Amino acid sequence: MEIIIKYRSLIALATVAALLFSVPQTALATPDIGKPAPAFTGTDSRGKTVSLNDFRGKIAVLEATNHDCPYVRKHYSAGNMQALQRDAAGDGIVWLQIISSAPGLEGHVNGREAEALNAGRKATPAGILLDPKGNIGRQYAARHTPTMAVIDATGALAYYVAIDSNSNGHPDSIKGVKNHVRAALAELKVGRMVSVAKTRTYGCSVKYVN
């Protein structure tokens, strides 16, 4: 009996340890509003090195994306994301897509494929950062796609995480809801602090490399 109890205790401890070590790094370090946004350097879809510091002095939007995710498709099929990108570009805002899906997992693409996807859906980000190792995604604690981060002209994180106020995956659910990214950009444009600076994440889990 004593042996069985000890054996079960060992199994329980091993299970707890496995769960602890399996917790993704994305759960550990959510960036802070008002603090410097996590600096990064990555490679874009054309092989160019891109750093966040390249855009100091400009407002920037980071869009963690996965074209196979229904929540991402919701915003692209309705033209919502493209409209945001166009309006942002018109205001001199830099919009960067970040693709953190690991090779062999849902949403992974190479540079040519990423550009073809955007051309097909008329998306116009300023750049596409390929992040197959998940380094940039983890820096921003991106748990889901889409994850949105708005960085002000001083380099501080001004808004973080959900694109809007409705976590329904159907395209019709966009109508009549508050778009948090659009609202944040409008406030920054006139020199105001973002009134709703942090929201609850929703979407598909980011397909990080193990």
Predicted features and spans:
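Thiol-/selenol-based redox modules, centered on thioredoxin-like
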Residues: V150-N210
